[in-house]
């Protein structure tokens, strides 16, 4: 089974485990690290996730994956919080984290309000409207970035 297929199947199984517990699946990674495959799930909930939450999800998910047995190779299962630099994956994330400092990387060069072209934008998240993410950049101007042009977006920790 291809890595993308595994991630898709895992997402479906994980949602069944997480949703009843009020947990959110933020991201799934299935990749080779050294000689071993690693299946890594990042989960969260309002107020933050605890180590006990991660352990409980890991146990329950491990039991289901052992029964379903669609991953043919040996792998290590890791369940973790998304951390301080949490990725923004869903449209709702852009509303939930409005006011927070974010870094956005785009697939191509885009112009900010002053016409400067760049692929990386750092600023305070204003929100999402009509498929466009708006940031107030550190330099003070606004950047409007179409959601479909975003390669990666994540919260940034302010010191």
From Swiss-Prot:
SUPFAM superfamilies: YhbC-like, C-terminal domain, YhbC-like, N-terminal domain. Disulfide bonds: none annotated. Pfam families: DUF150_C (PF17384), RimP_N (PF02576). One of its GO terms (cellular component) is cytosol. GO terms for biological process: ribosomal small subunit assembly; translation. Keywords: Cytoplasm, Ribosome biogenesis. InterPro entries: Ribosome_maturation_RimP, RimP_C, RimP_C_sf, RimP_N, RimP_N_sf. It is found in: Cytoplasm. The keyword Hydrolase does not apply. The keyword Electron transport does not apply. Belongs to the RimP family. NCBIfam families: PRK14647.1. Required for maturation of 30S ribosomal subunits. This is Ribosome maturation factor RimP. The lineage of its organism: Bacteria, Pseudomonadati, Thermodesulfobacteriota, Desulfuromonadia, Geobacterales. The gene is rimP.
């Amino acid at each position: 089974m291809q890595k993308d297929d595994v991630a898709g199947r895992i997402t479906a199984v994980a949602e069944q485990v997480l949703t009843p517990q009020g947990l959110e699946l933020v991201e799934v990674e299935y990749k080779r690290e050294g000689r071993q495959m690693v299946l890594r799930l990042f989960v969260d909930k309002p107020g933050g996730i605890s180590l006990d939450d991660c352990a409980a999800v890991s146990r329950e998910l491990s039991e289901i994956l052992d029964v379903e047995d669609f991953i043919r190779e040996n792998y290590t299962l890791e369940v973790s919080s998304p951390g301080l630099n949490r990725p923004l994956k869903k449209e709702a994330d852009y509303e939930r984290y409005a006011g927070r400092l974010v870094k956005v990387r785009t697939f191509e060069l885009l112009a900010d309000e002053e016409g400067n072209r760049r692929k990386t934008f750092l600023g305070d998240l204003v929100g999402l409207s009509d498929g466009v993410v708006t940031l107030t950049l550190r330099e003070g101007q606004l950047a409007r970035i179409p959601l479909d042009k975003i390669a990666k977006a994540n919260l940034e920790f302010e010191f």
